[in-house]
Amino acid sequence: MLQLGRRLLLRVVLFKLLKKFIYWLLVILSVPLVLITRVIKPLIFIRFGYFFSDRMGHFPFDVEYYLSVLKQKSPQKYTFDYFFFVGTPCNNALVEMVRRKVRVYSAIKLLYHANNLVPNGSSHVIRPAKEINASRDIGANFQRTRRCLEFSPEEMQSGKNYLRGLGYPEDGRFVCLFVRDSIYLADVPNRDFSYHNYRDSNIDTYEKVAAALAEKGYWVFRVGKVVEYPLSIEHSRIVDYASSSDRSDLLDIWLMANCHFAISTSAGLDVYRYSLVLLF
């Protein structure tokens, strides 16, 4: 049995080494393409970049930040930017929205690494906001631009249909309650995020504010992709969407993007520029 286990381990190690060898061989074979981009730079400027797509706190922000900065610059007619995603995307609906605005191809990763092998390639690299400013809009770019990541007409209609199915009135207003807990990051394999625990809150402590808003006529949606505990309060205008079977990647974004305002614990989709009450 021990010998069989060693053989399996050896196979796994050899497979990983072979996979890595093939990848870097493809990177080296991509170097001529990179050299071509250097030669044609005076005529056509090609850049390579990436976005960390595995965390909602960085993925939409970094894309929106790139698009907002780009929008404020003079149009670069002959500049073409290409990206790839790092990590497993945290939201598939967001991936579709990003692809409508940005050229994203998995093969760009090869060209990105090939570019790094050739000297003087820094001007051909676009770093994500996560590495530049920790995904913070320090230069107030969002204040000077309209949001770039927009919903398609079909996506907008899907969100409205969801509200209509709940009996939500056409002239209604709703608030999103986005309370962070530890279960979301607990699903990330091989990573210890316990240092984020100080940001977590008990959803029960927000029941009074949810009830007060509901009594004032607001609808309150508790949002989140995965949550540790359900919302125990019951009210016709309080919806524990995060714990419901209606939850979807599209609605996760749509509700936050279209709320009247949001109540959150140091988390949220800043890219949609809604009013936000932060509680620490």
Regions found by a protein language model. Give the residues of each.
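Short loop/helix-cap segments at secondary-structure boundaries that form the rim of catalytic
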Residues: 93-98, 228-237, 272-274
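Secretory-pathway glycan-assembly enzymes, especially type II membrane glycosyltransferases
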Residues: 2, 15, 23-156
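Short, hydrophobic beta-strand segments that form beta-sheet elements in well-ordered domains
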Residues: 84, 218-224, 261-264
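Short, flexible/disordered intra-domain loops and linkers
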Residues: 52-55, 185-199
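Catalytic donor nucleotide-activated moiety binding site of glycosyltransferases and closely related
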Residues: 172, 177-186, 203-248
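Residues at the starts of beta-strands that form the adenosine-phosphate
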Residues: 79-80, 219, 279
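A donor-sugar binding/catalytic signature common to diverse glycosyltransferases
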Residues: 252-280
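Nucleotide-sugar donor-binding and catalytic loop/hinge architecture
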Residues: 39-44, 136-137, 154-176, 180-181, ...
